[in-house]
Amino acid sequence: MNKLNYTLKGKVSLVTGAAGYLGSTISATLVNLGSDIVLVDVNKAKLNKVAINLKKISKQNIDIISCNLTSSSSIEKVVKLIQKKYGKLDVLVNSIGMVGTDKMKGWNTSFKKQSKKSWDNAININLTSVFFLIQALYKLMKKAKDSSIINISSIYGTNAPDQKIYKNTNINNPAAYSVSKAGLTYMTKWLASSLAPNIRVNTISPGGIKRNQSKVFMKQYISKTLLNRMATEEDIVGAIIFLATNMSSYVTGQNIIIDGGFTTK
């Protein structure tokens, strides 16, 4: 029987979207488990702040790369750094993504006003970039033992949104968000079957996470949950620890939904 190992000492992790609320929390979790880490995000200023905060709590190696992963040259840059410094990759967390509240013309708006440009951006960022990053990192992950890929999807990758939640708020649910997350969830299954047995691939699908939403939205959203609250970033940490370590050594191709019972109602 394999001994359960809650540590990532000696491991190397990569987190995309690392400057975001969830990405930074995931990064701190992996570092606290003892992993060296590479942080990737398009927002250099925020990424630097995340790195500074992580260095205050850990002596692990922390590398940052500010780039746009929709470009092949940026992906090559990430691969070269990991290859040169570490020679392997144990854990990849794809937390990159456009969310429903992102500020872009033709995005957080009604069905009739959603633009092709915002659609293309969402598919490229949330789905296409993830596939080609994994493809580029495959050899490095194969070199590591028990490597794990964790894709951050959404409950809207499996369930249609209840539009009543968005009534009388400044938040919409763009079609491309749900479509890209659905694609990510099912791409995870395809990758799990294609990369086995060397690499495990799983999805985490959070429900709505409490941030700066209006009281009206929060009340309407919470009414759909069983636990009478929205999620926090910390609610996702347990699943990250489970999937990143050998606690989940026999788990692949799965979608872990963390939504306070939202999708059961």
Residue ranges, per PLM feature:
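Conserved NAD(P)H cofactor-binding loop of Rossmann-fold oxidoreductase domains
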Residues: 95-107, 261
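Residue(s) in the substrate-gating loop at a strand-loop-helix junction
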Residues: 154
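Short C-terminal tail/terminal secondary-structure segment
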Residues: 2-5, 80, 161, 220, ...
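Short, small/polar-rich loop/turn modules that mediate ligand/substrate recognition or access, typified
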Residues: 146, 196-200, 251-253
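Canonical Rossmann dinucleotide-binding motif of NAD(H)/NADP(H)-dependent dehydrogenases/reductases
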Residues: 6-38, 191
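Conserved glycine-rich Rossmann-like NAD(P)H-binding loop of the short-chain dehydrogenase/reductase
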Residues: 33-50
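Substrate-binding pocket helix/loop in short-chain dehydrogenase/reductase
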Residues: 103-120, 163, 173, 221
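Catalytic Tyr-X3-Lys loop
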Residues: 98, 112-131, 150, 177, ...
